[in-house]
Amino acid sequence: MFKTEYHFEVKKRDWLLVVRLFGEIDHHGAVTLREDLDRLILKERPRRLVLDLSLIEFMDSAGLGLLMGRYRLMQDIGGVMVLSRPNQRIMKILRLSGMERFMEIEGVGAKGEQEDEAR
């Protein structure tokens, strides 16, 4: 696990890379997070990158830029990026930005709603 103003956990299986992000994605930590994610992506070269947003509490325009840049990087290396489990607040930001029209997003909903659906 890497730690700065944010932190994340990484799980890798074959050509799948799952990155679970915690906390906030804002202008304070976006540059360092971007650098760490880019290093990880270029080292592992996954075919599928899943960014688990279920524990993201806040995201601003720097966070949107971070997501867009990783989306493009994955396209450049021939892979795909999926956003997983954004809460309702983060999903609203993704909708307003237009990202939901071209990014694959799975498991939308508040954490409590997702747990209820799993039962």
Question: What is the predicted function of each stretch?
Answer:
Residues 59:
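Conserved TIR/SEFIR loop-to-helix hotspot centered on a Trp-containing motif
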